[in-house]
Amino acid sequence: MTAIRGGSRRAPGLALALLGGVLLGACHGDENAQVNALPGFVSGSVRKTAYDGASDDLLTAGLGKTGLGSDTRPGFANPAQPSAAELRRLAIYSNYRALVDITPNGGYGRFWGPNVDLAGNDTLGEGKIAGTEYLAYSDDGSGRKNVTLLVQVPASFDPANPCIVTATASGSRGVYGAIAAAGEWGLKRGCAVAYNDKGGGNGAHEIGTGVVTLIDGTLATASSAGSSSLFTASESSSTLAAFNSAFPNRYAYKHAHSQQNPEQDWGLVTLQAVEFAYWALNEQFGPVVDGTRHGIRYRPGDITTIAASVSNGGGSALAAAEQDTRGWITAVVVGEPQINVRMTPGVTVEQGGAPVPSFGRPLADYATLANLLQPCAAAAVAATGAPYLSALPMGVTQSIRTQRCATLAAAGLVSGADTASQASDALAQLYAAGYLADSDLLQAPMWDSQAMPAIAVTYANAYTRSRVTDNLCNFSFATTNPVTGAVAAPAVSPMTNLFGAGNGVPPTNGINLVFNGASGGVDHRLATPDASFAGAFCLRQLWTANQLGIGTNVDAVRVAANLQHKPAIIVHGRSDALVPVNHASRAYVAQNSATEGRASQLSFYEVTNGQHFDAFLSVPGFDTRFVPVHYYDEQALNLMWNHLKSGAPLPPSQVIRTVPRGGVPGAAPALSTANLPPIVQSPGANAIAVNAGVIDVPL
């Protein structure tokens, strides 16, 4: 690994200014620069590492298709002190497997995977890809933002036909978070891949020890790391010590506790990742101008650049395309984007010619409502037979559902004299809030898996700019006793491998979501018979009563759905119960048609039987009912590539009517093309009508 020095943290522009007029002219924003220079937002040094494509590589970290598919995760020579290379390998392994179905029957190795080429054929062997990585922080000079930027340049990159694909992390994952969702496709296409962690990045601070993570996942104390940490809680050491005394074994997380509302900058940092990629490509392929420095070979707009990713990363790509004023982005392809749309009067979402009950709500609204109601709605008749996605005994989960319904009823929040009727009313309220009946069997697993509670707590903290010491709504993040759920000291600190195994949103890697009640902190599911209803109700009230500045901070993350006439594709599963399609993609497409009118080049593909987490598709009940949305994300990328390179028309907006695999839960037959009809140029009755602010999706 080599280091390329960047700017000073105290004054990022000073070092560049001292180098003289020619180099100063190459700084961020100068379209006429002749010398390649790091953008002004790059803080500290750039780490450059070459990978041979055998012992280590860009896509699989040397594991290959077989290693990524193995249930045995890569280990460490010294478990107490893993190296940066070992942590990187584990991060690539964990993040790849977190976004796709990794089972052969589910499509791995057949429809996707390192061995599968872009035509869908098994021709690439273990699929290792040689190339170079560039790693650095983006910062605003404060040393507290520290967004991780990473550029991978494959050895197959053709300087005469350059391309970039963005792979902004999904969720709150680290910088490799979208390696399976967008990075893999870009690397196979021979494109540079521009990653960033969105300023969340799995950064944590262990309050009791003061240990924090660095850019490469290795650890340091907050005092020794200084401004080089991925994240350090902003409170003083004395305040944190007092907090630790009252609430031991707690953790601060960057997305939740940075007090920066990082989502408001997700579009900006995605653009910065692209600009950093331009710098890296000029550094690698630009002419040498004075024996040491490189000239400018590529200027904004010279490189075919597709902004791509899924979930939060997909929303970031859309936001970046809207904010692009310099021609960095050529086109957009995103899957299941989590996006908060600023809706204007007259915009409408319809299904089957009838207006849907609700659309375009922000995540802060629908997530806090779902977190409150889902444990009760899970007991509804319509949810019978839902996949079970919890480590708790079924009896405990059933008790939680009954007690949550009873507490909701006592509070006047649901009606009904018994659990069945209360659950039916809870589900009806979710329908009224824009959830589809297609998601009925997903309401239970979204809460049981703790996906929805995790999101409700993390985003409420972010949108209120809360500190870890605030214990917002009496929730915090802590290690717990695996039997009782009570807060307890860990046998081994989860910080050691957090960079490699964590996902940035507790519960993750042994750090759990706890409710701080009268008896101390306990796993939120077990803290009270109704699974911490008081905390869930508090989170809901933050939104409904517009408390602690939540409305202002949510407004800061809304987008206008103006893609500036860039060609774009959105893919979304109709059954998505985490990011409901009515509030995200359908709302975005409708608003885009009002904003851009006939100049819009946006196509929307809605996938029946598609849901948010392809990694769940191997779970019994998921395997028989749901199909991989990732398959269509890759098809959409190929369609966009052909559109940009050969002028092939993008297929119009349409519903893709997939066929579930069926069979016995846990033993569904192998996925085949019979389950996955293609995106077509003439969708007929499956066409989605979009015009003048109105979207009408066929039933």
Curated annotation (Swiss-Prot):
GO terms for biological process: butyrate metabolic process. GO terms for cellular component: extracellular space. The active site is at residue 311. GO terms for molecular function: hydroxybutyrate-dimer hydrolase activity. It catalyses: (3R)-hydroxybutanoate dimer + H2O = 2 (R)-3-hydroxybutanoate + H(+). The keyword Signal applies. Its EC number is 3.1.1.22. Keywords: Hydrolase, Secreted, Signal. It is found in: Secreted. Pathway: Lipid metabolism; butanoate metabolism. Residues 1-33 form the signal peptide. Belongs to the D-(-)-3-hydroxybutyrate oligomer hydrolase family. Participates in the degradation of poly-3-hydroxybutyrate (PHB). It works downstream of poly(3-hydroxybutyrate) depolymerase, hydrolyzing D(-)-3-hydroxybutyrate oligomers of various length (3HB-oligomers) into 3HB-monomers. This is D-(-)-3-hydroxybutyrate oligomer hydrolase. It comes from Burkholderia mallei (strain NCTC 10229).
